[in-house]
């Protein structure tokens, strides 16, 4: 699945983010921020 033009795809969880997809602290999985 692709994301809308103004959204970015978080490859780790295939989620569409309005912001960056990045890790939080010691968490391994990336999340929409």
Swiss-Prot record:
Effect in UniProt of substituting residue 4 to A: Biotinylated MCa: No significant change in stimulation of [3H]ryanodine binding to RYR1, and low decrease in cell-penetrating properties
Disulfide bonds: 3-17, 10-21, 16-32
Recorded consequence of changing residue 8 to A: 16-fold decrease of stimulation of [3H]ryanodine binding to RYR1. Biotinylated MCa: 3-fold decrease of stimulation of [3H]ryanodine binding to RYR1, and no change in cell-penetrating properties
Residues flagged as site, Essential for stimulation of [3H]ryanodine binding to RYR1: 31, 33
Annotated InterPro entries: Scorpion_calcine
Effect of residue 26 to A: 4-fold decrease of stimulation of [3H]ryanodine binding to RYR1. Biotinylated MCa: 3.4-fold decrease of stimulation of [3H]ryanodine binding to RYR1
Consequence of substituting residue 13 to A: Biotinylated MCa: 2.6-fold increase of stimulation of [3H]ryanodine binding to RYR1, and low decrease in cell-penetrating properties
Effect of residue 2 to A: Biotinylated maurocalcin: 3-fold increase of stimulation of [3H]ryanodine binding to RYR1, and no change in cell-penetrating properties
One Pfam family per UniProt: Toxin_27
Localization terms from the record: Secreted
Listed result of changing residue 23 to A: 13-fold decrease of stimulation of [3H]ryanodine binding to RYR1, but loss of induction of calcium release from sarcoplasmic vesicles. Biotinylated MCa: 9-fold decrease of stimulation of [3H]ryanodine binding to RYR1
Effect seen on changing residue 24 to A: Loss of stimulation of [3H]ryanodine binding to RYR1, loss of induction of calcium release from sarcoplasmic vesicles, and loss of induction of long-lasting subconductance state
Effect upon mutating residue 7 to A: Biotinylated MCa: 2-fold decrease of stimulation of [3H]ryanodine binding to RYR1, and low decrease in cell-penetrating properties
Record-annotated site: Important for stimulation of [3H]ryanodine binding to RYR: 8
Region entry Essential for stimulation of [3H]ryanodine binding to RYR, spans: 22-24
PTM notes: The non-natural D-maurocalcin (a chiral analog of maurocalcin composed of D-amino acids) completely loses the ability to stimulate [3H]ryanodine binding and calcium release. Its protease resistance, combined with its efficient cell penetration at concentrations devoid of cell toxicity, suggests that it should be an excellent vector for in vivo applications.
Superkingdom in the source lineage: Eukaryota
Effect caused by changing residue 19 to A: 6-fold decrease of stimulation of [3H]ryanodine binding to RYR1. Biotinylated MCa: 2-fold decrease of stimulation of [3H]ryanodine binding to RYR1, and important decrease in cell-penetrating properties
GO cellular component, one term: extracellular region
UniProt tissue specificity: Expressed by the venom gland.
GO molecular function, one term: calcium channel inhibitor activity
UniProt record similarity statement: Belongs to the scorpion calcin family.
Entry note about domains: The presence of a 'disulfide through disulfide knot' structurally defines this protein as a knottin.
Described purpose of this protein according to its UniProt entry: This toxin stabilizes ryanodine receptor 1 (RyR1) opening in a long-lasting subconductance state (48%-60% of the full conductance state). Furthermore, it triggers calcium release from sarcoplasmic vesicles (6.6 nM are enough to induce a sharp release, and 60% of the total calcium is released after toxin (100 nM) addition) probably by acting as a cell-penetrating peptide (CPP). In addition, it has been shown to dose-dependently stimulate ryanodine binding to RyR1 (EC(50)=12.5-26.4 nM).
Name this protein carries in UniProt: Maurocalcin
Organism expressing this protein natively: Scorpio palmatus
Lineage, top ranks: Eukaryota, Metazoa, Ecdysozoa, Arthropoda, Chelicerata
């Amino acid at each position: 699945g692709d994301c809308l033009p103004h959204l970015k795809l978080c490859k780790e969880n295939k989620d569409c983010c309005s912001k960056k997809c990045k890790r939080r602290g010691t968490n391994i999985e990336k999340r929409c921020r």
